[in-house]
Design a protein with these regions (language model features):
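Conserved, well-structured core domains of diverse proteins
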Residues: 1-124, 131-135
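Residue-level signature of transmembrane alpha-helical entry/exit and packing/kink sites
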Residues: 95, 99, 130-134, 153, ...
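Membrane-embedded alpha-helical segments and adjacent helix-loop junctions characteristic
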Residues: 117-118, 138, 158, 166-264
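A generic structural signal for ordered alpha-helices
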Residues: 14-28, 85, 123, 140, ...
């Protein structure tokens, strides 16, 4: 029979395993990458706190900077050279291209912020430069999804992109009139549900602070407090240890963003 102490120890072990995994990865990381990540994350945090507590900036300044910093952190934290079994230096060219293209995308939006404020979606025609930026943006986001999330989501995105392009050739119920390539890029980049739409706005205004708070809370011992609270709520009930594990993991997930990872 699992005791209450065993349930508490298991919940703490799950939390520590994730921290140990990250700590091990950072320890084995080359120093230049480690310090680059440290500097970037500090700059990112200061930038986010500034626009939240001091002075909000133009959306076309905030969103591209948020996106660029996130992408560069992904490329440094998950380099392609470590994903491949062979340590081929040519993979670094791909990572350098991704970092450079992320910065180019950010520069484009920052330098055209004023014009973009007056741009009318579905009315203004996409310029050649905008199409190129949109293509680079889609490549960067899809590669970030592939490295950080999963290949399954990557292929789901590929499927729907292919459907948007080839849907006009599909017979039957799923056929539609089709969409031009520049128009598709406009929807993906400028659309309300596109890359610079509500998903990125939510990440900028809510998700980032949620994750930062959860990290500080857990590293300051807050996870143990939530686990103790879960134990107290269920210690006198039938199946108390199991309930304590679920309650504690749910409470911890509310601030860490990973409830499922803590329930096992």
């Amino acid at each position: 029979k699992v005791s209450a102490l065993d349930a508490k120890a298991k919940a703490l072990a799950n939390e520590e395993d994730e921290d140990t995994k990250i700590a091990k990865l950072l320890k084995n990381m080359p120093k230049w990458r480690f310090y680059s990540l440290a500097v970037l994350t500090v700059i990112w945090t200061v930038f986010q706190l500034y626009i939240k507590l001091v002075k909000p900036l133009d959306p076309w300044f905030q969103l591209p900077l948020h996106m660029c910093l996130a992408l560069v952190v992904v490329w440094l934290y998950n380099p392609m050279v470590e994903k491949s079994k062979s340590h081929n230096k040519l993979w670094w060219i791909y990572d350098i291209f991704l970092i450079a293209s992320s910065c180019f995308i950010c520069w484009f939006f920052l330098s055209h912020a004023e014009q973009l404020n007056y741009r009318i979606f579905n009315v203004d025609v996409m310029t050649t430069t905008e199409v190129i930026v949109a293509v680079l943006l889609v490549i960067n986001v899809m590669e970030a999804v592939r490295r950080v999330v999963s290949m399954s989501l990557f292929w789901v995105i590929c499927f729907f992109l292919a459907y948007a392009w080839f849907g006009q050739y599909i017979p039957g119920l799923f056929r539609f009139s089709g969409i031009s390539f520049p128009k598709l890029m406009e929807v993906l980049m400028y659309g309300e549900n596109g890359i610079f739409g509500s998903p990125l706005v939510t990440s900028l205004g809510t998700l980032f602070y949620f994750l930062v708070f959860g990290t500080f809370f857990s590293n300051c011992g807050g996870g143990g407090v939530l686990i103790d609270g879960g134990m107290k709520l269920s210690d006198k009930t039938v199946g108390g240890p199991a309930k304590a594990a679920v309650i504690s993991s749910g409470l911890l997930g509310m601030v860490s963003g990973s409830a499922i990872a803590n329930v096992s």
